[in-house]
Amino acid sequence: MELSNNKIKEYTKRLMLSKMRILCNNGFYGLLLMHMKYGLDEECETVYTDGKVIRFDPKFLDELNDDELDFIMMHEILHVALQHCFRGIELEQELYNIACDIVVNSNILLSNNMDTRTITLRSDGEAMHLAPNGKEGYEYTAEEVYNMLQKNLGVNNAKFQSTNRSNSKGKKGGDEKSNKPTEHLSEFGRNIIDNHTKWKQIEKGEKLQELWL
């Protein structure tokens, strides 16, 4: 379905106002967001970045209030700034995506005086932000959290899931079983907000990476 010019203008205004709010309240994130381009993608279901552009599904954008939109904008730009888009290519992707989100969400939480409302979506609840050892994700790199997640598979992951999902409803329902090595984290992984599939298409040698060094 083709979007009307008025709708596109409405979305453009919302994203611009979000950048302005973030620039006033969290200058670090606001300045980073000024380097990005923005777009719409009706097929992506939520939101994603390829390191150059942050693209929203219009339906997902319509569901977000201003506070939620600001959180999502900060979430996406921090993935880029921390080079999550360029790293972890050789790692198990589902597990790495979870690790990256834990680190990003925890850093956003820290930037907002540990107010969990700032990393909460009405549809999903409180975003995951604790490492498997119960400490905040901002204390670690994504790779360090990834290694913890690997060790927790089949050991303490039930407790880990419970801790991180205490205030989360999850976005995608269902109880499908999987043979993946991450099947024990399938419920927990549903709390991933954005789409990380574009990361696989980014080559390490690109000049794009140099922008964020």
Q: Which residue ranges define each predicted feature?
A:
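Basic/hydrophobic alpha-helical interface regions
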Residues: M1-L69, M73, I77-M114
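Negatively charged
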Residues: N107-L213
